[in-house]
Amino acid sequence: MAAPVIIVGSHVWVEDPHLAWIDGEVTRIDGINVHVKTKKGKTVVTNVYFPKDTEAPSGGVDDMTKLSYLHEPGVLRNLETRYELNEIYTYTGNILIAVNPFQRLPHIYETDMMEQYKGIALGELSPHVFAIGDAAYRAMINEGKNNSILVSGESGAGKTETTKMLMRYLAFLGGRSGVEGRTVEQQVLESNPVLEAFGNAKTLRNNNSSRFGKFVEIQFDKNGRISGAAIRTYLLERSRVCQISDPERNYHCFYLLCAAPPEDIKKYKLENPHKFHYLNQSSCYKLDGVDDASEYLETRRAMDVVGISNEEQEAIFRVVAAILHLGNIDFGKGEEIDSSVIKDKDSRSHLNMAAELLMCNAQSLEDALIRRVMVTPEEIITRTLDPDNAIASRDTLAKTIYSHLFDWIVNKINTSIGQDPRSKSIIGVLDIYGFESFKCNSFEQFCINFTNEKLQQHFNQHVFKMEQEEYTKEEIAWSYIEFIDNQDVLELIEKKPGGIISLLDEACMFPKSTHETFSQKLFQTFKEHERFAKPKLSRTDFTISHYAGEVTYQSNHFIDKNKDYIVAEHQALFTASNCKFVAGLFHALHEDSSRSSKFSSIGSRFKQQLHSLMESLNGTEPHYIRCIKPNNVLKPGIFENFNVIHQLRCGGVLEAIRISCAGYPTRLAFYDFLDRFGLLAPEVLEGNYDDKVACQMILDKKSLTDYQIGKTKIFLRAGQMAELDARRAEVLGNAARVIQRQFRTCMARKNYRSIRNAAIVLQSFLRGEIARAVHKKLRIEAAALRVQKNFRRYVDRKSFVTTRSSTIVLQTGLRAMIARSEFRLRRQRKAAIVLQAHWRGRQAFSYYTRLQKAAIVTQCAWRCRLARRELRMLKMAARDTGALKDAKNKLEQRVEELSLRLHLEKRLRTDLEEAKVQEVAKLQEALHTMRLQLKETTAMVVKEQEAARVAIEEASSVNKEPVVVEDTEKIDSLSNEIDRLKGLLSSETHKADEAQHAYQSALVQNEELCKKLEEAGRKIDQLQDSVQRFQEKVFSLESENKVLRQQTLTISPTTRALALRPKTTIIQRTPEKDTFSNGETTQLQEPETEDRPQKSLNQKQQENQELLLKSISEDIGFSEGKPVAACLIYKCLIHWRSFEVERTSIFNRIIETIASAIEMQENSDVLCYWLSNSATLLMFLQRTLKAGATGSITTPRRRGMPSSLFGRVSQSFRGSPQSAGFPFMTGRAIGGGLDELRQVEAKYPALLFKQQLTAFLEKIYGMIRDKMKKEISPLLASCIQVPRTPRSGLVKGRSQNTQNNVVAPKPMIAHWQNIVTCLNGHLRTMRANYVPSLLISKVFGQIFSFINVQLFNSLLLRRECCSFSNGEYVKTGLAELEKWCHDATEEFVGSAWDELKHIRQAVGFLVIHQKPKKSLKEITTELCPVLSIQQLYRISTMYWDDKYGTHSVSTEVIATMRAEVSDVSKSAISNSFLLDDDSSIPFSLDDISKSMQNVEVAEVDPPPLIRQNSNFMFLLERSD
């Protein structure tokens, strides 16, 4: 790699012994060495340095391929920056790096986050483990290929949690919703806690470390649904069962079992963990924040889900308990040499417990532990083991049992889940241990590192392939890129024959082989190998140079750990066990060992498993996740650079970067290149060149050669970016000097002008002072002249006024005398006229009174005659129908109820008034008392003051008299008295002031109490009104529900079937007579002739219904803004009295007609038409129908209407002749407005129809809303991010924007205008169909809420959207929406604009200047009061200024936000920073009824088809 070109002043990274890398500024260059002043102030001389990108975003980049300088310090700094902001995921191409936060971040793993990443291309949203899972799933679905996700990292890096999240997301994508019972995805997910319980343990580095590797193959069918799964495990750490170091723990299952419920403890004969040898080797028994008792129950539940029966679970935990008891068996020396026996009673007890749990003979178990049988050709020899070998035999038995128990659990899970032979594709998730290098490395580390060497080779090949695909896609010329191939290391380990594993197997087959002979064999075989070395100070250790560094292995236990055999005595013991489960484990093992007589070791078998795994991975499309542990103390907020660099190296990330640097590490889009380096050739920006041509011109001008230009990007070799930055820095430095020179010139000119202006001001002031002195002298002289003139005028005027006043007094007296004489004459004449007028008026009034009495007598006689005639007619009608009597009784009952309620209301109001009066009286009395006290206090003060004054006067007179020696005592006493009186006066004055203050405060309290009393009175009135309204509403709903329940219970199936027949009779008023006919209830005809007319009536009624349904099935439009169909249906149902019958089919047929009209309907016009009709018809029903037991019809009572029947009849005679009859017998009942709609006690079919119609209204509303969302969704994707315009020609565009920077370019808001066009279209459609304004405003309110949710969520998930220019773009678009809301008026939009509060405040935060000066309080209370702390933290950390280069909020604010987010995440139920879309119905039936204006139903013209039919003539009746 060529050395980067730098100059003095460049910023570079240099090595640091404490921070790994530290940044500084170049101060001097000496050949290849540079002098760098670090940020700590220290000067470093080095020749190893890397350029630093000073323009890198403050929050880092989400994909490290976007870094201008792709090198180790740049990668490290980017990861550290993002980790500080809780951004734990970062891409490196399509590789995901996950840094363990060591704290819970539940808000980024919730279901709504899964929905956001579903179907989104990789890299479009912020880095996330869900994005990798989705990319694998989409590649499998679209390309039909098998995919794999490889999760790697060292212990504690978060591999297990990452794998669980991946499997959870894949189950979310491929799950089956609504399926009952155990599904495959549930079993796959629940297998994790089972395997964790038996395969995970606490280590020094991790509290939940997986001590085995696993590869989960999830199978999918052709529809992308999970159809099966298989789990493969690798290299379980068997030695942990018997040996653990402090403060580690054994496998979790042992501790879970010790914390089981008491009955299980007793069953398995367990005690506290510290009583068992296999557990008390460490002082750690419990994990922080983990409840073993609840985890035990959770594990049992998970075992149920994965298909392990209760009997099998009991057997599993019996084996686990038996292993604990085996560990407590100790041995002592026997009587014979090299023999052993059970040490004590405690060991014997544990032996018996283990035998009982394993269901085998205790003596046989003892013999198997301490005796061995050797078979020779001559005889069978039985020998006894010494205590050490007996302990080794015990531990071997425990490890063998546990390892095969674990294998059985894995096989059982696979069997239970099942594999689908018809599956089309799979996604494999590999969770395997990362590269390990400790002080002591044994056989386990050797196998683990061998695995990682294999995976690293696969990883390098994949990275190289991705590089080639990138170059090929961009159509640039490329040559072979060299990368370090670790094939030689793999051959060193696995070559057959001659590899380390082969030599180890060879040593295991010879009984006399030791680790020393094995080590010597290695040294002899590989002494010339480049990757193999022998440490100088050890005879048995050996060192291998892996890809991640050198590792020294201790070969002491290699041979023992590589052997895989079972003692024959152990196998015979457990094969004969009475427990089928235990016998099955060892029986299966016996079958496996009997099939092959060839020696099989752990290493060889692991190599075969690894070879099989690599074959599986090679057949899939890989996706990589590298997990990083930021520190070794397992605490959040700590980032250890050396530790992270080591893991990046072990994970192959740095190797991938090196491969990238071998080609073209710097890749910039044309737009970004021109934005950064366009200033190197300003003439290019001023011209109308294509972006690609402009980039070529800049590179040619700077004479660069190591680059390639692709289709969309520029590819730069290593060092070229630094050279461009150096030249750019030079240009910027020259420009800075020019700016400084101009600034200094400006400041000097400004200083000169200020001095000159000061001199001018001083001169002007002096000249002004002289001029003012002269002017003052002239003013004094002029004033003296004016004073003399005015004095002379005053004297002359005073003389004239005196003479004039005397003359006026004389004239006034004479004129007054003449006027009084004239006034007396006029009063006399007026009195005479008044007397005459009163006399004439009295005579006329007497005549009028007599005439009026005669007329009244005549009118009364005539009205009595008419009343008797009408009374006879009413009595005849009452005898025929009996309806009037029922109406009279019901109305009288209603009058009594209303009277009682009125009396109750009056009584409540009277009580309230009395309480008010009493309270006011108390307050007035208290006020009066305080006033009296104040008067008394004032009087006392006055008296005291008078007494003091007298005393002072007396004292003064005394002082004036001559004083003699004998009066000294008297003078002293008087002085004391004066002082006492003065003190008393001051105290009384103070008391008076306090009383005055108390009085004022009492007045204020009195006013406040009066206000509170008035407010309480108003609230009581409002509450009483609200309670009354709610009581009426509840009563109405209870009545409806009661009717519906009773009717549903009483109607038999046969009756229900009859109720749906079209032949059901509907009450109808005949036009010939004012009587009512119903074929089922009234009998106006003779019995023998009843059937034929009734049949004719039913047929006629059926024809009328068919005609009505035929009419409303078509679009019959609107009449003067009123929906004709709704009015037509309502008038017909009222006229036919359909609401009052027990059975009818008309309602069901109307509902079916509406359903057929809107079913699968995509036409907004049709939906809006039926929405308008449904709303109007529901409004009629809401105002008309009420639940009741009878079907009588009542009219709302007007104020002042008489309560008795005859009173109303007599009142009707005094009204107009047209209203003399019953209101429902005239057209006014239908033709009136809403205030005159009569109420009907509806029956079951009518109430059911109302509920069905309400459901259809909500359905139509939802269809319109969802259709609008579907149309707007594609447009919103283009509205969240500002479209990029060609960078060349930008200078010209800037000059135009400078002249008119208010109006945004039309292409920039084209997408927003499309949304406005869509909204206008729907608004016109709804207004054309006269949809109620309430529904229109609710629709747009939810649409704007949807826009708010989509834009806000996209803003929080896409870092490129959280920029200054993007905020301006979205703000411009929101202004378009605000303008539309203003034009559409509040009547139709309502509070829709307020629904955008989240995105408006977020955008306002993006575009505000001087963010670092804003405090958290200002942000949360003034700028963004609606946003939560999680949302503010997300925006603040993702913000970047692509226009002015400013920074986000201060680091102190960020730290405070992070702390609050951490606190909230611990306490809140939901921590998601995303918004949820609300799809509820935001209105009620009452809201619609109250919002709609009066509708004159009678004024609606029926359609021609109805108008021409004589049976519908009642529709043509009009109201006056």
From Swiss-Prot:
Give every Dilute domain span.
Answer: 1148-1463
Q: Where is this region: Actin-binding?
A: 492-526, 528-551, 586-610, 610-632
Q: Which InterPro entries match?
A: Dilute_dom, IQ_motif_EF-hand-BS, Kinesin_motor_dom_sf, Myosin_head_motor_dom-like, Myosin_N, MyosinXI_CBD, MYSc_Myo11, P-loop_NTPase
Q: Where is the Myosin motor domain?
A: 59-729
Name the chain's protein.
Myosin-5
Give the protein's biological function: Myosin heavy chain that is required for the cell cycle-regulated transport of various organelles and proteins for their segregation. Functions by binding with its tail domain to receptor proteins on organelles and exerting force with its N-terminal motor domain against actin filaments, thereby transporting its cargo along polarized actin cables. Contributes to the trafficking of Golgi stacks, mitochondria and peroxisomes. Required for development of pavement cells, trichomes, and stigmatic papillae.
Sorted alphabetically, which keywords does the UniProt record give?
Actin-binding, ATP-binding, Calmodulin-binding, Coiled coil, Cytoplasm, Motor protein, Myosin, Nucleotide-binding, Repeat
Question: Which Pfam families does the UniProt entry name for this protein?
Answer: DIL, IQ, Myosin_head, Myosin_N
What's the source species for this entry?
Answer: Arabidopsis thaliana (Mouse-ear cress)
Q: What happens when the gene is disrupted?
A: No visible phenotype.
User: What's an example of a GO molecular-function annotation for this chain?
Assistant: identical protein binding
What remark about domains does the record contain? Answer: IQ domain mediates interaction with calmodulin. The tail domain is a globular cargo-binding domain.
Enumerate the spans annotated as Myosin N-terminal SH3-like domain. Answer: 7-56
Q: Which residues form the IQ domain?
A: 732-761, 755-784, 780-809, 803-832, 828-857, 851-880
The UniProt record gives the binding positions of ATP as 153-160, 206-214
Q: How does it assemble?
A: Homodimer. Interacts with MYOB1 and MYOB2. Interacts with PHOX1.
* Lineage of the species this protein comes from: Eukaryota, Viridiplantae, Streptophyta, Embryophyta, Tracheophyta
Bias class Polar residues marks the residues at 1076-1086
